[in-house]
């Protein structure tokens, strides 16, 4: 069911109706429910991946504060294990801190807006195979963007601890993608995404452009 998306299906007469066939979509929707512990209807188009619980904790803390803010577009937080948080929920962070999410291989949290333009965070755990699996299944939802957040494992001489490192390369020694994308084909960075993250860093930090360039590395 991935032939169209992988660019290996070349129709002679009829064009496909979508990127994935119906069986592939149904299978992936079921897998998303299983892996993340949340309804597929709650997934938002802006997806973050992480494998560190501290990023989950910060996302939950910030999400709960947004739900309580009357000027915020966010109306609810859907959490792995069937937990649903709104402005009326008492002690929301305590409700989320139970162990329900640990029952799922790649638990998810969805910060939902009324128009469905919110943010989803998925804790993908450790390993490139997990990352590929969740991306394969999320692809049927056609999200606007997905980003991996984590921390850098090494520093150049020009970098210092605390710098924001925007990764734009992938060392393919894990061979996870070899079957669909041979290693001799490079995976380029997306300039539009890099520029958007740079502009967002400048806006949130309040630092002038030259100072941001000293702290943000690619």
List the predicted regions and their residue ranges:
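Accessory terminal and edge-of-domain segments that mediate assembly/interaction
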Residues: 1-145, 153-218
